[in-house]
Amino acid sequence: TTIIKMLSCLTKPTSGDILVGGYSTTKEPEQVKRLIGVSPQETAVAPNLSVKENLELICGIHSFSKGKTEEKIRELSGQFALDTVLKRKAGKLSGGWQRRVSIAMALISEPQILFLDEPTLGLDVIARHELWETIRSLKGKITIILTTHYMEEAEALSDRIGIMKSGKLLAVGTVEELNALAGTNDFETAFVSIVKEDTVV
């Protein structure tokens, strides 16, 4: 979560700098913000607004015309199957639906990079798998950086995985590469081995 906040210019690093798309998060935050969309761990939906009003709010922040706003809401409603809940208060939706709306809101500005911070935290198994399908539908269209504590989720969704401990990036690679590094065929076992070793590789 702290890394996501630094990458999205919400928190400044205590030292050093981060480049996103070639822009500095500390010196050029406005340029970075134009490149990214963020669905935070605490969903960004306004609970007292309808789903449609939430989407309209973000379109307004980006100064979309009425026509572009309507077009964008139609597009996202189809992409995220929101048609049946557009008029419902966001706060009355399940956690899975709220997360889906939050991701749709993050995509309104058509970012190049989407940050998903613990997207399925607190969801039941069915809602989690449904959201996985939503995230899979975005692959190939946009760069997604996702944080998770669920090994199964990382394995199911990621092309490349970075393993972190106490703010230190220990290893980066595909599931197969990380398994080979740890000498196992099981990713959860590989994760435990790499974290216990606590050595950057």
Predicted regions mapped to residue ranges:
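A short, proline-enriched helix->beta-strand linker immediately N-terminal to the Walker B motif
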Residues: I108-Q112, K141
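ABC ATPase "signature
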Residues: V172-G173
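Conserved ABC ATPase signature
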Residues: N48, K89-L93
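Conserved ABC ATPase "signature" region
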Residues: E56, G60, G67-V85
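Helical segment within the ABC ATPase nucleotide-binding domain
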Residues: R128-G140
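Catalytic Walker B motif of ABC-type/P-loop ATPase nucleotide-binding domains
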Residues: L114-D117
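Helix-to-loop junction immediately C-terminal to a conserved catalytic motif
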Residues: S8
